[in-house]
Regions:
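Acidic-aromatic/histidine active-site loop/patch
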Residues: 219
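Short phosphate-binding/catalytic loops that engage adenosine nucleotides
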Residues: 34, 90, 224, 290, ...
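A conserved regulatory-domain signal marking ACT and ACT-like small-molecule sensing domains
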Residues: 57, 237-408
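Nucleotide/pyrophosphate-binding catalytic subdomain
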Residues: 1-216, 298, 310, 386-387, ...
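Short hydrophobic alpha-helical runs that function as membrane-insertion/retention elements
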Residues: 168-172, 226-228, 293, 374
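Residue-level detector of flexible, active-site-proximal loop/helix-junction positions
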Residues: 99, 233, 379
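Glycine-rich beta-alpha junction loops
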Residues: 43, 175-177, 222-226, 230-235, ...
């Protein structure tokens, strides 16, 4: 008998019929003797609908009250799924995040989990219940409802698995695992049987929508055995995400080609080249709670430098506004921006021991006439910023160049 945490996303529970199908799947697992904790998202589109209602009332909704509103989406799903499980003859009990004491900090709309009180869940499991928990939400020390941000249900599932020392955390989505790249761009893309936490973390940070990045961080930190599966397939092993030493003896050089369209570039031109200037630019950006990704500095011969960095496209206007205020203070000439960029990355733990990956990547892009605007590297990743019009071509040619359509 195993203790398994299963998480079902909004698409998986998007209709009452799909909720019934999920209940049938859960019933099969319980009949095999497993103890089950189920984490669910709101039904497809429900969170956006609730945010829309809030914005109809208040253009910039109060974060505390917005959390109260959007947390109701998961509450509907847990109740419906518990009823569906009862119809399958199972004992089921549903809980909101606050009810099971998923304790978070007080950062509304982007809270982080601090602690989970698992006693109530363990008692229900011992009594033979399937425990259904609302993802995406918790409660702070003062008793305020909090939410974890987009994709937070993945984090809830992994955090519960860590707290309960579950044998496995299964993330059910509308895809059957992690692929070498998006099959919609490269039909020959392969499903990976396994991938390391490091690789999955890079791919999640680079825009892969299979798993939310914080959930991968959590799983890696607490060594939670994580598996991605499709809720629309009866069979299939999905993709196992594991620590590197548990993976196959010889790693492939590259495991996947990831990409992100949600990128924009900002450049501060004519910046005085003096110590501390990077902090003077990026400090106010950080104070505005904006995330910076890639950074490049071009030093000129006239005592000035051009300072460029990338942000999420959705935060471009806010970041540009901050820079316009900074410009006069630091004596820069101009702020320019470009929303028409993308990021493409080659990811793989195997590149640690195989030189020449970067040169192969750059040569492949050059042969297609694709100009590289920015470059960033880590031990297991090489990322380039390109004109967005080249995204799909770049992904296809790199996938082919690294022979990812063939199993190693």
């Amino acid at each position: 008998m195993a203790l398994i945490v299963q998480k079902y996303g909004g698409t998986s529970v998007g209709t009452t019929e799909r909720i019934k199908n999920v209940a049938k799947r859960i019933a099969r697992f319980q009949k095999e003797g497993h103890q089950l904790v189920i984490v669910v998202s709101a039904m497809t589109g429900e969170t956006n609908r609730l945010i829309g209602l809030a914005k109809d009332i208040q253009a910039s909704p109060d974060p505390r009250e917005l959390d109260v509103v959007v947390s109701t989406g998961e509450q509907v799903t847990i109740g419906l799924l518990s009823m569906a499980l009862m119809e399958q003859g199972l004992k089921a009990r549903s809980y909101t995040g606050p009810q099971v004491r998923i304790l978070t900090d007080n950062t509304h709309t982007k809270a982080r989990i601090l602690k989970i009180d698992e006693d109530r869940i363990r008692q229900d499991l011992d009594e033979g219940h399937v425990v259904v928990v609302a993802g995406f939400q918790g409660v702070d020390e003062a008793g305020n409802i909090t939410t974890l941000g987009r994709g937070g249900s993945d984090t809830t599932g992994v955090a519960l698995a860590a707290a309960l020392h579950a044998d496995e955390c299964q993330i059910y989505t509308d895809v059957d695992g992690v692929y070498t790249t998006d099959p919609r761009i490269v039909p020959e893309a392969r499903k990976l049987d396994r991938i390391t936490f490091e690789e999955m973390l890079e791919m999640a940070s680079l825009g892969s929508k299979v798993l939310q990045i914080r959930s991968v961080e959590f799983a890696g930190k607490y060594k939670v055995k994580l598996r991605v599966l499709s809720s629309f397939q009866e069979d299939g092993e999905g993709t196992l995400i594991t620590v590197e030493e548990d993976s196959s003896m010889e790693q492939p050089i590259i495991s996947g080609i990831a990409f992100n369209r949600d990128e924009a570039k900002l450049t501060v031109l004519g910046v005085p080249d003096r110590p501390g200037i990077a902090y003077q630019i990026l400090g106010p950006i950080a104070d505005a709670n904006l995330d910076v990704d890639m950074i490049i500095q071009n030093v000129g011969h006239d005592g000035t430098t051009d300072f460029s960095f990338t942000v999420n496209r959705s935060e471009f206007d806010k970041a540009r506004g901050v820079l316009e205020e900074v410009k006069a203070h630091i004596g820069a000439r101009e702020v320019v921006g470009d929303k028409g960029i993308c990021k493409v990355s080659a990811v793989g733990v195997g590149m640690r021991s195989h030189p020449g990956v970067a040169s192969k990547m750059f040569r492949t892009l050059a042969e297609e006439g694709i100009n590289i605007q920015m470059i960033s590297t880590s031990e297991i990743k090489i990322s380039v910023v390109l004109d967005e019009k080249y995204l799909e071509l770049a992904v296809r040619v790199l996938h082919k160049a690294f022979e990812l359509d063939h199993a190693n």
